[in-house]
Amino acid sequence: MTLGSRVTTLESGNAAEADASSRGWFVGDLAGWAAERGESFDPSSTPRQSADVQVKWFVHPPGHARAGWAEPDRCISLCVLLDGEMRCDFRSRDGVEEPVRLTRRGDYVIWHGPSWAHTWRTESGCTILTVRWPVGEALKQR
């Protein structure tokens, strides 16, 4: 049942098993991710469909690394370490690099996407919860 654009359904599950994108994202543009895979999806079927926020649960194996730099995006991103260790590297528009190490349960890094490119590498196997949401013009376009 929906009320306006708000889903009034209650849903519970397991984030690791609810991956809708094949990349760990389980809240966000589920319909868009299904379309990328050629699948059909009814966005009104779950409160996990959202244009306002994306949530990712991902278990990384030891030594897992992002291939290259993720270009700055118009969103704010928050990564929270649940277990293991991860190194995140950030590069500002003027070329300044900032390393961040997440080593203790609950360590986090948050950044405003338009300001920073980023990449990462796991030091050991780790589990990360990532939340991102649009800001500024990106939010106005939704």
List PLM regions with ranges.
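Glycine- and acidic-residue-biased ligand/ion/polar-headgroup-sensing regions
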Residues: D73-R93
